[in-house]
Amino acid sequence: MRLRKVKDALVRVQDSPYFSNPEQLSTIESESLFVEIGCGKSWFLSQQAQQNPKCFFVGIEREPTIVLKAINKVNRLEVKPRNLLITCLDANQLTEYLKPQSISKIFINFPDPWPKKRHTLRRLTAPHFLKQFHQLLKKQGLIEFKTDNDQLFEFTLEVLQKTVAHFKIIEQTTDLHNSPLTSTNIMTEYEQRFVSLGVKIKKLTLEKLN
């Protein structure tokens, strides 16, 4: 379904306590900074924030209209988190606004698989993205990656084989909801839909090396 863009979406959220301009991200002080790249409408992010009040969560979304929808959704929560911000930013720009070794964990949930070969570099698990994430993560920082797409999952495994100096796989499953990992899993809205259709969810957890 094509997204209906909202005019002046970012203007509407400028005064929200849950919105951050990218330039403000480097001022966040937290021993446990968690970042979700492509936070969508913020269900997963807000659940994480509520369940982990001692951590700080930042949602990255490049489409202003989705940023607006995400913040509106947080505003409708009965219990509103105080440890959450959402910003409008492309994943390629993360290293411009976040300090090196400042992030404890990165979540990549159901990213666009970009199936065409000419779009390989747009995949969030492409080598240049993993290199950026390695730079941003603290020592032994983590990446949690979930997808319903078999091809993207296999692509990611192939990339990791070629970049073994950067990350090691500490959790891996091709059927998350029939694995022990489901006990601590928080589902995204996409994930709920996929599971209801019987789609198997793939997951990797990566730990930073060096």
Swiss-Prot record:
Instruction: Write out the entry's keywords from A to Z.
Output: Methyltransferase, S-adenosyl-L-methionine, Transferase, tRNA processing
EC number(s) per UniProt?
A: 2.1.1.33
- Annotated metabolic or biological route of this protein: tRNA modification; N(7)-methylguanine-tRNA biosynthesis
Cite a single GO MF annotation.
tRNA (guanine(46)-N7)-methyltransferase activity
Q: Name one GO cellular component term.
A: tRNA methyltransferase complex
Keyword tRNA processing present in the record's keywords: the answer is yes
Alphabetized InterPro entries for the sequence: SAM-dependent_MTases_sf (IPR029063), tRNA_(Gua-N-7)_MeTrfase_Trmb (IPR003358), tRNA_methyltr_TrmB_bact (IPR055361)
Q: Which Gene3D superfamilies match?
A: Vaccinia Virus protein VP39
Q: Which CDD domains is this protein grouped with? A: AdoMet_MTases
Sites binding substrate sit at K116, D148, T188, E189, Y190, E191
Catalytic activity from the UniProt record: guanosine(46) in tRNA + S-adenosyl-L-methionine = N(7)-methylguanosine(46) in tRNA + S-adenosyl-L-homocysteine
Q: Where does S-adenosyl-L-methionine bind?
A: E36, E61, D90, D112
- Residues of the active site are D112
Which Pfam families did the record assign? Methyltransf_4
Record-stated family: Belongs to the class I-like SAM-binding methyltransferase superfamily. TrmB family.
Q: What is this protein's function per UniProt?
A: Catalyzes the formation of N(7)-methylguanine at position 46 (m7G46) in tRNA.
Its protein name is tRNA (guanine-N(7)-)-methyltransferase
This protein's species is Mycoplasma pneumoniae (strain ATCC 29342 / M129 / Subtype 1)
